[in-house]
Each structure stands twice: as structure tokens, then as C-alpha cells.
Regions:
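Basic Arg/Gly/Lys-rich low-complexity intrinsically disordered segments
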Residues: 1-2, 19-21
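Short coil/turn segments at secondary-structure junctions
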Residues: 1, 125-128, 189-193
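Conserved class I S-adenosyl-L-methionine
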Residues: 216-221
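SAM-dependent Rossmann-like transferase core, predominantly class I methyltransferases
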Residues: 175-213
């Protein structure tokens, strides 16, 4: 979808289109085998169902709105993150990947004084090096900013302001923006990890699988 033109001045965030009611493509990763429970949870939290939900192993795609993004980040027990898809296209070479990333209006989402990192996952990808694929995305982001403003954001692997996710699936590539920041199992309440900590998302998945906790309605019959 088209994005309004926006620029970041100094360290300020751009005016993002968060209040618009346009449809967004979201991906919610989860532990393998948990995706059906996650689909039920998303349905219970947002009302999304049918063609608005696509279940895959290790996550679900959802067609939602910004209000759904906020609600899922706040209330989801099972999702690891809430990712917003900004681009998806056939991509069989590093040059094609660079061109895809260069077309994304990153300046609508963050500015030159913000830091970012690129994480990459793959399933059946033809790319020889995932690290090089991530590097090409970093180059494209930096070059786009430099072309438009004469400056570029810095890469920061630890606690960046922005996380970009690159997913390579066969001959296709997706670029997604992380709306969650820290993984959703890190809610900030745990003071002591203990000897064998259990991730909150995994604990919730175990409860869902046991039948102890059931959403009010199922998204998938």
C-alpha cells in the first residue's frame, strides 16, 4: 500500500501512518506446532478469520489493521513478534534483492539518526549466503537514505531502534518491519531467570495444547 511522504528531522520519528485504517499484511512467528493455537488466539483478540488468516508451519499471516497490531502486541500469549510486511516479490539473485529493498520507503518509518539491524530467515532459499543477503539489504537501506538526505542510519546489532526482517522462501523474498521490539515473551516482569526458565510463549502454548485455556471461538473448524 502507498505510504504518505514523511521525513525524520534529527532524531525524531517520522509521522507514520499509524492512524490510517488501511489493510496491513502481518506475520506472527511462533514455535513450530503452535500455529493453530495462535490462529485461534488471533481470532479471539481481533475477530480475524477465514481469508484474513493464513496458517503456515511456524507462524501465521494475518490481514489486519493498526488497531490489530497494537492489540496483538499487548495481549498475544503465543506470538513471538508481530511483523509488518513492507515488500514481497520474486527474488532469485542478490541484485534483485537489493533492488527490492531499495524500493521500500524506509524514510517513512525511521530516520538517519536511528539505528537498525537486519535479521534473516530462510526456507528452501537459493541464496548461497544468508549473511550476504542481509548485507545487501543493509546496503540498500543505507543507499536509499543517502540518496535522499545525504546521510544514512547506522547499523547496530545490540538493541537497535529498528529491526528489519528478511525472509527468503524459495524464489521469493519478504521484507518485514518488527513492530514489537523485544520478543513478546520478554514482558519486563521477570527479575530472576532461575536455573531453568521457561519462555512465557512456550508456557502459554503448553496450556493451550492441554486444553486448559481455550479461546471463545475457533478460527479454523
Amino acid at each position: 500500500p502507498a505510504r504518505p511522504a514523511a521525513r525524520a528531522a534529527g532524531g525524531a520519528w517520522p509521522t507514520m501512518p499509524c492512524m490510517s485504517d488501511e489493510a496491513l499484511t502481518l506475520f506472527l512467528p511462533c514455535a513450530a506446532g503452535v500455529q493453530d493455537f495462535l490462529a485461534d488466539e488471533v481470532h479471539g483478540l481481533t475477530g480475524l478469520a477465514g481469508q484474513d488468516l493464513l496458517i503456515e508451519r511456524g507462524g501465521i499471516y494475518a490481514r489486519g489493521r493498526w488497531r490489530d497490531v497494537m492489540r496483538l502486541n499487548l495481549h498475544s500469549r503465543l506470538a513471538q513478534r508481530v511483523l509488518l510486511e513492507l515488500a514481497h516479490a520474486p527474488c532469485e539473485s542478490e541484485d534483485a534483492l537489493y533492488a527490492l529493498a531499495r524500493r521500500v520507503p524506509w524514510e517513512d518509518w525511521f530516520g538517519t539518526r536511528h539505528t537498525f539491524r537486519v535479521d534473516v530467515t530462510a526456507r528452501g532459499s537459493a541464496f548461497k549466503s544468508l549473511q550476504f543477503a542481509a548485507l545487501r539489504v543493509k546496503d540498500a537501506v543505507a543507499d536509499r537514505f543517502r540518496e535522499r538526505s545525504g546521510a544514512r542510519p547506522s547499523v547496530q546489532t545490540q538493541q537497535p531502534d529498528v529491526r528489519i526482517h528478511l525472509h527468503l522462501d524459495g524464489a521469493h523474498a519478504s521484507l518485514l518491519l518488527d513492530t514489537s521490539g523485544e520478543p513478546l515473551f520478554k514482558r519486563g516482569w521477570r527479575q530472576d531467570k532461575g536455573d531453568a526458565p521457561l519462555k512465557e510463549t512456550l508456557a502459554a502454548a503448553m496450556l493451550a495444547a492441554s486444553g486448559w485455556w481455550q479461546p471463545a471461538r475457533r478460527a479454523v473448524a
